[in-house]
Amino acid sequence: MTVGARLRSKASSLVGRGPLGRLRRAGDEETDAIVEHLEGEDEDPESQDCEREEDGRRAGTPSARRVHLAALPERYDSLEEPAPGDKPKKRYRRKLKKYGKNVGKAISKGCRYIVIGLQGFAAAYSAPFGVATSVVSFVR
């Protein structure tokens, strides 16, 4: 038996579903109320028996403008416990140390390359004139 045939037979054996894709049980009042409300929205909007307010919606239907407010307690208690004070300081110190090392390396390499560049510029400038150039090696 192929996969498609198995799925077809399984789908045909399933219990029929309601109009909204949910199983409807007899006596389920909440589901019945929701379905009746949703099916009621499918009515003809131009029907005579629906009373409308001045903004174009049915009387008694909730609108998006209605705001529900809830009273908050006097004192707010956070759900998360604050972290101890010494941990961020250690982490911050480690980051500063790491960045300091990297900046120090960049400056020393940059200084070395600047000295090499200046020596090359001096050699190129003085070479046409036949003046001997002394190259001083830059050692840290």
Curated annotation (Swiss-Prot):
Instruction: Please indicate if the UniProt record lists Transmembrane helix as a keyword.
Output: yes
Summarizing the function annotation, the protein's role is: Regulates drug efflux through modulation of ABCB1 localization and activity.
- The protein in question is named Required for drug-induced death protein 1
Q: Which cysteines are joined by disulfide bonds?
A: none
Mind listing the GO biological process terms from this record? regulation of response to drug
A single GO CC term for this protein reads:
membrane
* Membrane topology recorded in Swiss-Prot or TrEMBL: Single-pass membrane protein
Q: Where in the cell is it found?
A: Membrane
Q: Where is the composition biased (Acidic residues)?
A: 29-53
Database matches in PANTHER family: REQUIRED FOR DRUG-INDUCED DEATH PROTEIN 1, SI:DKEY-126G1.9-RELATED
Q: Which UniProt keywords apply?
A: Membrane, Transmembrane, Transmembrane helix
**Which segments cross the bilayer?**
118-140
Question: Could you tell me the superkingdom of the organism this chain comes from?
Answer: Eukaryota
Cite the residue spans of the region called Disordered. 1-95
Pfam families given for it?
RDD1 (PF15828)
